[in-house]
């Protein structure tokens, strides 16, 4: 199976740095897939559950937040604001964040507040989705 190097990093730590066979992620346009030999590509990511298939084809799942993803020379680098493995997610905290975001969306009329609340809701929903997997 063809493989490539994947690095997922946040301002605090590196979550993964190793060989993988596939990455499935999401940007503002929709879901996309990266395989070995992918053309150079740069995109902004949105909060989602990112699927990582290791070199044996086994899948791992990771919450990735907003950030950038770069593909170049058979290497994929995620620089995201936050990322968590399923066992690191605090489900109660994510539920509280979801409820706060939904309340903010109901009560705020300011566009900036709406955008922030939608982003917070997307982060919370992605974390909860991953926790349920």
UniProtKB/Swiss-Prot annotation:
Disulfide bonds: none annotated. Gene3D superfamilies: ATP synthase delta/epsilon subunit, C-terminal domain (1.20.5.440), F0F1 ATP synthase delta/epsilon subunit, N-terminal (2.60.15.10). Belongs to the ATPase epsilon chain family. InterPro entries: ATP_F1_dsu/esu_C_sf (IPR036794), ATP_synth_F1_dsu/esu (IPR001469), ATP_synth_F1_dsu/esu_N (IPR020546), ATP_synth_F1_esu_C (IPR020547), ATPsynth_dsu/esu_N (IPR036771). Its main location: membrane. This is ATP synthase epsilon chain. It comes from the Bacteria. The gene is atpC. The keyword Nuclease does not apply. It is a peripheral membrane protein. GO terms for molecular function: ATP binding; proton-transporting ATP synthase activity, rotational mechanism. The keyword Ion transport applies. GO terms for cellular component: plasma membrane; proton-transporting ATP synthase complex. Pfam families: ATP-synt_DE, ATP-synt_DE_N. SUPFAM superfamilies: Epsilon subunit of F1F0-ATP synthase C-terminal domain, Epsilon subunit of F1F0-ATP synthase N-terminal domain. It comes from Clostridium perfringens (strain SM101 / Type A). Keywords: ATP synthesis, Cell membrane, CF(1), Hydrogen ion transport, Ion transport, Membrane, Transport. It is found in: Cell membrane. Produces ATP from ADP in the presence of a proton gradient across the membrane. F-type ATPases have 2 components, CF(1) - the catalytic core - and CF(0) - the membrane proton channel. CF(1) has five subunits: alpha(3), beta(3), gamma(1), delta(1), epsilon(1). CF(0) has three main subunits: a, b and c.
